[in-house]
Amino acid sequence: MKNIAIIGASGYTGAQISSLINAESTMSIQGLYVSENSLDKGKALSDLYPAYSHIDLCLTPLTDDAKQTIVATADAVVLATDHGVSLHLAAWFYQQGLAVFDLSGAYRFSDVAQYPKWYGFTHEYSQVLADAVYGLAEWNAPQIATSKMIAVPGCYPTASLIALKPVAHLLTDILPVINAVSGVTGAGRKAQLHTSFCEVSLTPYGVLGHRHQPEIATQLGQEVIFTPHLGNFKRGILATITVQLAAGTTASDIEKAYQCYDSAELITVKQNQFPKVDDVVQTANCHLGWKFDEQSGYLVIASAIDNLMKGAASQALQCIKIHFNASVNH
């Protein structure tokens, strides 16, 4: 039985992974934690999320004593916290010998020079960063199994990379174009005007400047044009990706490339059929659909995931299971 501490449990992602871990027969929740100044400290998780009434745990403030208790009693820590918070907590728990699964972006880039530009801080833990593994579960399982510092990918990069990595060897110098729409939960639980019921609409944001663009490019090995959009629905991501493939590429070549997912039970690939968000909401699955025009050489791929599940919590759980050698296919 692996004992897992969850820090940042009051947010959408933290609550989601709390529910997932609570349902695992080989795992237990060591504790649910929030910051010392959180207005939610002391509340039951079910007070914030009645759907989780079966989880009889309260949100504990993360004091120094609480951190020492985690080190003494937990096998792993999940960080569902802001990048600037995870930066320090991840390094501290890692240095204490715990496995760390960080859902923020604080350890996704191996290059320290990326952090001031994209996250607004200077990374001061170069050795921990050097040990960090990018937790794209279907692609980096051997590294996830052996590292104790796992940077769980962002939601948009997960949807995009699962779609693009199988055909990366077929790409030309023309940049892939990724247009992706996310549900409002992707913006977090904190009240904001642009995510309020009367204001939310379908709109692009972070145009030519979203931090997930370099994350996708780094892991793909090629620059991309990425435009995220906020949709007027709660959860889910649909990414539509257009790429030009090398001259002479055939539909059979693409079909063969996607056979890398034949044994990946959480990924479904279909030719000339396209997914919708409702197909994957509340699941750990990724649905891909693709169509290829041999005359122009253009391939269009659609990738659908639940942003809180495969785009965050359930992928973190996959990484935990890979690390502790448990079954991941449910």
Swiss-Prot record:
One of its GO terms (biological process) is L-arginine biosynthetic process. Pathway: Amino-acid biosynthesis; L-arginine biosynthesis; N(2)-acetyl-L-ornithine from L-glutamate: step 3/4. Keywords: Amino-acid biosynthesis, Arginine biosynthesis, Cytoplasm, NADP, Oxidoreductase. The lineage of its organism: Bacteria, Pseudomonadati, Pseudomonadota, Gammaproteobacteria, Alteromonadales. It is found in: Cytoplasm. GO terms for cellular component: cytoplasm. Its main location: cytoplasm. Pfam families: Semialdhyde_dh, Semialdhyde_dhC_1. One of its GO terms (molecular function) is N-acetyl-gamma-glutamyl-phosphate reductase activity. The active site is at C155. Gene3D superfamilies: Dihydrodipicolinate Reductase, domain 2, NAD(P)-binding Rossmann-like Domain. Its EC number is 1.2.1.38. It comes from the Bacteria. InterPro entries: AGPR_AS, AGPR_type-1, NAD(P)-bd_dom_sf, NAGSA_dehydrogenase, Semialdehyde_DH_NAD-bd. The gene is argC. It catalyses: N-acetyl-L-glutamate 5-semialdehyde + phosphate + NADP(+) = N-acetyl-L-glutamyl 5-phosphate + NADPH + H(+). Belongs to the NAGSA dehydrogenase family. Type 1 subfamily. The keyword Amino-acid biosynthesis applies. Catalyzes the NADPH-dependent reduction of N-acetyl-5-glutamyl phosphate to yield N-acetyl-L-glutamate 5-semialdehyde. This is N-acetyl-gamma-glutamyl-phosphate reductase.
